[in-house]
Amino acid sequence: MAIIQLSNIKKQYENGILVIDDLNLTVADSELLVLVGPSGCGKSTLLRIIAGLEQVTSGELYIDDERINDREPADRDIAMVFQNYALYPHMTVRGNLEYGLKNRKTPKDEINRRITHAAKLLEIESFLDRKPRQLSGGQRQRVAMGRVIVRQPRVFLFDEPLSNLDAKLRAQMCIEIKTLQRSLGTTSLYVTHDQLEAMTLADRIAVINKGAIEQIGTPIEIYDTPETTFVADFIGSPPMNFLDRKILEQHLGYSFSYNKETDLLAFRPEVILLGEYPDKGPVFHTQIELIKPIGTGCHVLTRWNETIFTIEIKERLTNDYGKKLSFTVPHQNFHTFNKTTGKRKSNK
C-alpha cells in the first residue's frame, strides 16, 4: 500500500493568511488516520494539498519514498471522496463507477471485474442501472466510495463525506467505512469536525488547531490523556470541566500539594462520585441548573460559585431544577494543565 509523509508543510495565501504552519505528519501503511478540528483549522486544506488540488508554500510531501510535490493530481495515485457526492447526474451508477476507468483506458473485462467487486463490497448491486436522483443520501455516498474503490489507488482521502447525512445514517456509514477500509487495507486520511466520527473511525487521531497539530494518538490516548487544554475541551461530549486550582483551594481549602506548579485542573463529566467522600477528593456542593436526559441517565449542568460544571450521572432526574447536588471528584481523576501555555503538567 503506502506510507504518507508530510515534512514541514506550510501554506500561506497571497493575502498573508497562514493556514498551515510547519506541520509534520506520517500516516502508516494501511492506517486510517483522522484529522479532526473546528471549522477553519486547515484540515481540509491539508487534504487538498496531499491530493494536489492546492500547492504548498514550503515543505515536502512523500508517498512511500517518492516526492510528489510537483506531480499532477492525476499522477499521484490518490482517490478522494468529497462532502458533496460529485456524481454525474446523467449517468447511471454503473456509468459513474466506470467513467474514470474508461478514461484511463482500462480493459473492459477489468472494469467489469472491479465494478462487480466494489458493488458487492458496498451492497449496491441492485441499483447499478439507476440514476443518482433515484438514490437516497446513503446510497449516493456508497456510490461515491465505489468510485474511489474501483480506482484501486495507493491512498484514500475522505473530506467530511458524511456531513450531509442524518445522525442515524452517519453512524451506520461510519461503521461501513471502517469495515471497508480494514478489508481493503488502503492507507487513508479522513477529515471531519465531528469528534464522534473521529473516535469511531480512527486508528489514530490528529487534532488540528489553527493549522498546527495539537496531539496525535489513538482515540483512547486522546481521550484519556489530552496534551493541551484545547484537546481536553474539544474531545469529549460533554467536554472536560476546567477549574482554577487557586479558586478550588480558596473555596474548599483543598490543596493539591503533589503538583504545586499546576494552575488549571480538569475532570471528565463521568468520573465524579455522587455524594460526599472527602477522603477520596474535593467535595462540591452545587445547584442544578439544567438537566439533559441521555436515556441511560443524564448530563447535569450544576453551578458551583460562579463556575458551571457538567456531570454525567446514571440516575434519571426530572424536575430537580434548583435543587442542591453534592459530588466528589477523586483526586486521581484530575488532569492538570499550565494555565498560561495550555500544556499538560502531569498524566492525572
Curated annotation (Swiss-Prot):
Gene Ontology terms: cellular component: ATP-binding cassette (ABC) transporter complex, substrate-binding subunit-containing
Principal location: membrane
Superkingdom classification of source: Bacteria
PROSITE patterns associated with the record: ABC_TRANSPORTER_1 (PS00211), ABC_TRANSPORTER_2 (PS50893), UGPC (PS51315)
The ABC transporter domain, residue ranges: 4-235
Topology in membrane: Peripheral membrane protein
GO biological process: carbohydrate transport; glycerophosphodiester transmembrane transport
EC number annotated for this UniProt entry: 7.6.2.10
Enzymatic reactions: sn-glycerol 3-phosphate(out) + ATP + H2O = sn-glycerol 3-phosphate(in) + ADP + phosphate + H(+)
UniProt keyword annotation of Translocase present: yes
KW Cell inner membrane (keyword) present: yes
Key words, A-Z: ATP-binding, Cell inner membrane, Cell membrane, Membrane, Nucleotide-binding, Sugar transport, Translocase, Transport
Enzyme class: translocase
UniProt-annotated location(s): Cell inner membrane
InterPro entries: AAA+_ATPase, ABC_transporter-like_ATP-bd, ABC_transporter-like_CS, ABC_transpr_MalK-like, ABC_transpr_MalK/UgpC-like, Mo/tungstate-bd_C_term_dom, NA-bd_OB-fold, P-loop_NTPase
SMART domains xrefs: AAA (SM00382)
Binding, ATP: 37-44
GO molecular-function terms, A-Z: ABC-type glycerol-3-phosphate transporter activity; ATP binding; ATP hydrolysis activity
Assembly description: The complex is composed of two ATP-binding proteins (UgpC), two transmembrane proteins (UgpA and UgpE) and a solute-binding protein (UgpB).
Entry similarity comment: Belongs to the ABC transporter superfamily. sn-glycerol-3-phosphate importer (TC 3.A.1.1.3) family.
Record's function text: Part of the ABC transporter complex UgpBAEC involved in sn-glycerol-3-phosphate (G3P) import. Responsible for energy coupling to the transport system.
Entry-linked NCBIfam families: PRK11650.1 (NF008653)
Record PANTHER family: MALTODEXTRIN IMPORT ATP-BINDING PROTEIN MSMX, SN-GLYCEROL-3-PHOSPHATE IMPORT ATP-BINDING PROTEIN UGPC
Protein name, entry field: sn-glycerol-3-phosphate import ATP-binding protein UgpC
Species: Bartonella quintana (strain Toulouse)
Lineage, top ranks: Bacteria, Pseudomonadati, Pseudomonadota, Alphaproteobacteria, Hyphomicrobiales
Gene giving rise to this polypeptide: ugpC
